[in-house]
Structure formats: C-alpha cells, structure tokens
Regions:
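N-terminal membrane-anchoring/stem segments of glycan-assembly enzymes
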Residues: 1-12, 65, 69
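Cell-envelope/extracellular polymer assembly enzymes that use nucleotide-activated donors
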Residues: 15-17, 49
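Short, well-formed alpha-helical segments that are part of the catalytic scaffolds
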Residues: 25-39
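Short, acidic, metal-binding catalytic loop of nucleotide-sugar glycosyltransferases
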Residues: 35-47, 122
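A conserved acidic beta->alpha catalytic loop
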Residues: 53-61, 78
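Long helical/loop segments within the catalytic core of UDP-sugar-dependent glycosyltransferases
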Residues: 73-95, 109-191
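Short aromatic/hydrophobic "clamp" motif used to bind/position activated sugar donors
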Residues: 98
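The conserved acidic donor/metal-binding loop of glycosyltransferases
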Residues: 102-106
Length: 192
C-alpha cells in the first residue's frame, strides 16, 4: 500500500508534537536523539514542539531537556510503561499531529517533511469542522533504525558484522507484511 506524496504549501504545515520516550536510558544516548530532533527540518520551526517523556522522572534528564531547549514530562511511577508515558504527555499537549521516537533513535532531518504532508488535508478539514471524504491516513510508520547495538549484536560481540535485528525487521519483513495488508505496529518506532 503506497500513497502518492502530496505537495503542500509551507504555510499549511500544522503544529506537531515530537515525543521521545525514555526509561532508564543513559543521558548521553538521549542527548544524541534529542539533539537530532531539534535539527529536523520544518517550514516553521515554531510549530515543532519536542518533549522528552521520562517515565523514571530523573533530574538529570530534565536538566538535559532544559539545556537542549525542549520540554520535559516526568512520570514518577512508570504506570502502564511506555503507553502510560505517552498518555501522560498527550494529556499535556495539543498539537493535531504527534511524532514518536524511542530514546535510541535518531530521525533523519527530513522526517517531518516526508511524513506530515499526508495528514495536512485531514487536519485542515478537522480544524474547519468539514467532512473529509477521501481515504484517511491514521498512522505513518517509518523503518526503525537504531544507532546502538541490539541485544543479539551486543551479546555476540558482532556489532560491526551482523545487521541490527530491528532494522532488518522494519525494512524487510514489515514491508513484506504491509504489501499483504498485515503490517505490525510497534510503539515507539518513528511514527506520525
């Protein structure tokens, strides 16, 4: 299932909340992800609202978020794991679109420019109270690429010789599944 990428005028791009979920990841690893998110391209950068969603409520992560000029939502009790972490953030944000990233993911600079256009007409119809009678897009899931070794690579000391298992799954297996109407949704992956 493929869609033709819509051409959208720059002034039509809506606000988007970028949520980075973290649970005990090292602040040094988080720095790379947060920093990359701040460099994502968008026609009006004031419409991109980046938040670190920390379900362990760590002071050093709140400080890092502040240093990088992004928002921070701490969750003290880790209630409902990652979904609880995201729900906590969603109760405090209001953009019509949400992009999610795991703590160990670095988005491409063009991530928002390549995903948001598919939603613009729907967002405008919703905001104007109009009916939207075209095919609707509810979620765009992009291939998952980590910059740290997965558990198999790490345990086999083969970070440089084996492909990342998650990378292989999202770029090969899930693409095949999608072509047969059976793609899997994986929370935290790079979504809008």
């Amino acid at each position: 299932f493929e869609l033709e990428e819509p051409e959208i005028a720059k002034e039509r791009y809506p606000d988007v909340d970028v949520l980075i979920a973290t649970h005990n990841e090292d602040p040094e690893l988080l720095y790379k992800t947060i920093n990359a998110c701040t460099f994502m391209e968008y026609p009006d950068k004031s419409k991109v609202h980046i938040y670190v969603c920390d379900d362990t409520n760590r002071l050093e992560v709140a400080k890092l978020a502040d240093e990088l000029g992004v928002g921070y939502f701490g969750l003290a009790d880790n209630k409902d794991a990652k979904s609880g972490n995201y729900n906590n953030a969603l109760r405090q944000t209001s953009s019509p679109l949400v992009a999610t990233f795991d703590a160990d993911m670095i988005p491409y600079r063009e991530f928002l420019l390549e995903t948001v256009p598919y939603f613009v007409e729907q967002v405008e119809a919703y905001e104007n109270g109009d009916d939207y009678d075209k095919s609707k897009v509810g979620l765009i899931q992009t291939p998952q690429s980590f910059y740290n070794a997965d558990i198999f690579q790490f345990n086999l000391f083969s970070e440089s010789t084996l492909p990342n298992e998650q990378d292989f799954f999202s770029k090969e297996i899930n693409v095949f599944n999608n072509s047969h109407g059976a793609a899997l949704y994986k929370i935290g992956r790079a979504h809008v």
